[in-house]
Amino acid sequence: MSRYRGPRFKKIRRLGALPGLTSKRPKAGSDLRNQSRSGKKSQYRIRLEEKQKLRFHYGLTERQLLKYVRIAGKAKGSTGQVLLQLLEMRLDNILFRLGMALTIPQARQLVNHGHILVNGRIVDIPSYRCKPRDIITVKDEQNSRTLVQNLLDSSAPEELPNHLTLHTFQYEGLVNQIIDRKCVGLKINELLVVEYYSRQT
């Protein structure tokens, strides 16, 4: 299954706010109206919608998300929490959380076009897994910095999660640590996502 490129508002109306996909928000009560029209949700549908939330927010294909679930399942600790850590530490998501992009697809484009360096080297892989003490900078060229400055100016001021530090004037972000669960930027029940995949096998 390919990455979703359809109408974004249609997705947030069904699944709720997906800040990584779009800055738009569903109207208050729209999800309740949808639920009343379709009747009581089955447990399968509830798990499916949580999985879809995760997939659309982070901009992943079905195959990519399944791969992350399998990696998380082999790691120590809670599979759901490890899954969220893996997704949150992707380079495209780190740029989004720093405010250097308004959405994760936008952050992915910055990376794909060679505007972003990690520890002084250009990284053009959006799924690159950032680690504590990684330094993310914008390429020292006028077009790269003007592009990111415009995005920084356009992004709504939000408190940075505690695992990140932003030095705006240096066009630089620092990864301080692995993200805490409470700082994840999406309202999600990750256990339902793990359950969804465990029942598919």
Curated annotation (Swiss-Prot):
<feature type="domain" description="S4 RNA-binding">
    <location>
        <begin position="89"/>
        <end position="152"/>
    </location>
</feature>
<dbReference type="GO" id="GO:0019843">
    <property type="term" value="F:rRNA binding"/>
</dbReference>
<comment type="function">
    <text>One of the primary rRNA binding proteins, it binds directly to 16S rRNA where it nucleates assembly of the body of the 30S subunit.</text>
</comment>
<keyword id="KW-0150">Chloroplast</keyword>
<protein>
    <recommendedName>
        <fullName>Small ribosomal subunit protein uS4c</fullName>
    </recommendedName>
</protein>
<dbReference type="GO" id="GO:0042274">
    <property type="term" value="P:ribosomal small subunit biogenesis"/>
</dbReference>
<feature type="region of interest" description="Disordered">
    <location>
        <begin position="20"/>
        <end position="44"/>
    </location>
</feature>
<dbReference type="GO" id="GO:0003735">
    <property type="term" value="F:structural constituent of ribosome"/>
</dbReference>
<dbReference type="InterPro" id="IPR005709">
    <property type="entry name" value="Ribosomal_uS4_bac-type"/>
</dbReference>
<comment type="function">
    <text>With S5 and S12 plays an important role in translational accuracy.</text>
</comment>
<dbReference type="Pfam" id="PF00163">
    <property type="entry name" value="Ribosomal_S4"/>
</dbReference>
<keyword id="KW-0699">rRNA-binding</keyword>
<dbReference type="InterPro" id="IPR022801">
    <property type="entry name" value="Ribosomal_uS4"/>
</dbReference>
<dbReference type="GO" id="GO:0009507">
    <property type="term" value="C:chloroplast"/>
</dbReference>
<keyword id="KW-0687">Ribonucleoprotein</keyword>
<keyword id="KW-0694">RNA-binding</keyword>
<comment type="subunit">
    <text>Part of the 30S ribosomal subunit. Contacts protein S5. The interaction surface between S4 and S5 is involved in control of translational fidelity.</text>
</comment>
<dbReference type="InterPro" id="IPR002942">
    <property type="entry name" value="S4_RNA-bd"/>
</dbReference>
<keyword id="KW-0689">Ribosomal protein</keyword>
<dbReference type="InterPro" id="IPR018079">
    <property type="entry name" value="Ribosomal_uS4_CS"/>
</dbReference>
<dbReference type="GO" id="GO:0006412">
    <property type="term" value="P:translation"/>
</dbReference>
<keyword id="KW-0934">Plastid</keyword>
<dbReference type="Pfam" id="PF01479">
    <property type="entry name" value="S4"/>
</dbReference>
<dbReference type="InterPro" id="IPR036986">
    <property type="entry name" value="S4_RNA-bd_sf"/>
</dbReference>
<dbReference type="InterPro" id="IPR001912">
    <property type="entry name" value="Ribosomal_uS4_N"/>
</dbReference>
<dbReference type="GO" id="GO:0015935">
    <property type="term" value="C:small ribosomal subunit"/>
</dbReference>
<comment type="similarity">
    <text>Belongs to the universal ribosomal protein uS4 family.</text>
</comment>
